[in-house]
UniProtKB/Swiss-Prot annotation:
Disulfide bonds: none annotated. It comes from Thermococcus gammatolerans (strain DSM 15229 / JCM 11827 / EJ3). InterPro entries: Ribosomal_uL16, Ribosomal_uL16_arc, Ribosomal_uL16_CS_euk_arc, Ribosomal_uL16_dom, Ribosomal_uL16_euk_arch, Ribosomal_uL16_sf. GO terms for cellular component: ribonucleoprotein complex; ribosome. The lineage of its organism: Archaea, Methanobacteriati, Methanobacteriota, Thermococci, Thermococcales. This is Large ribosomal subunit protein uL16. CDD domains: Ribosomal_L16_L10e.
């Protein structure tokens, strides 16, 4: 069976379903690497992507974001000039009640009898204004970090915004963006 549209799973409307010891057949996470780039260096700026509203991000989208951002930064900045971290983990188990369709489907389908559903994937639950991912870079590579965040926003189910922080953790988004436009 194919992958369902993401709009089915993006809302946080059901209770959390995370206790894997009670779930038979729960799939494992597709995303395994959460830190990329130069993990030991100190960088001047932190660019973080925040969620504008509560949402669920499927593990397929997280893996696509990881591949896209990492590849873009490696190509434009170089492996030793950034640190990229995904800050959310897909704990939420997604379920689907497969419905039988077609001719004589009523003979072998259950319909809504026992409709709890089978596990089909995982998702990360994100609260409003929570950091989804972060890139640490120096000032000369800041525009590439912002480009990477723009590419990551396209793969999210709902809108997001980015913030730029200095080493002390102060929000310097407006100051940095005003100097970059000149």
């Amino acid at each position: 069976m194919g992958l369902r549209p993401a709009k089915i799973d993006r809302d946080v409307d059901k209770p959390a379903y995370t206790r894997r010891e009670y779930i038979r057949g729960a799939p494992g996470p597709k995303i395994t690497i959460f830190d990329m780039g130069n993990l030991s260096a100190e960088f001047e700026y932190e660019v973080s992507l925040h969620a504008e509203q509560a949402m669920q991000i499927r593990q397929n989208a997280l893996e696509a974001i990881r591949i896209q951002v990492n590849r873009y930064l490696q190509k434009n900045v170089g492996r030793s000039n950034y640190h990229f971290k995904i800050r959310v983990y897909p704990f939420q188990v997604l379920r689907e009640n497969p419905m039988a369709t077609g001719r004589k489907a009523d003979r072998y389908g259950n319909g809504m009898r026992r409709p709890f559903g089978k596990p089909i994937g995982l998702a990360a639950r994100v609260k409003k204004d929570q950091k989804i991912l972060t890139v640490w870079v120096n000032e000369q590579h800041l525009k590439f970090a912002l480009g990477a965040m723009h590419r990551a926003k396209m793969k999210l189910p709902y809108s997001a915004y980015y913030r730029i922080y200095d080493r002390e953790g102060n929000d310097v988004t407006t100051k940095v963006l005003s100097t970059m436009k000149r």
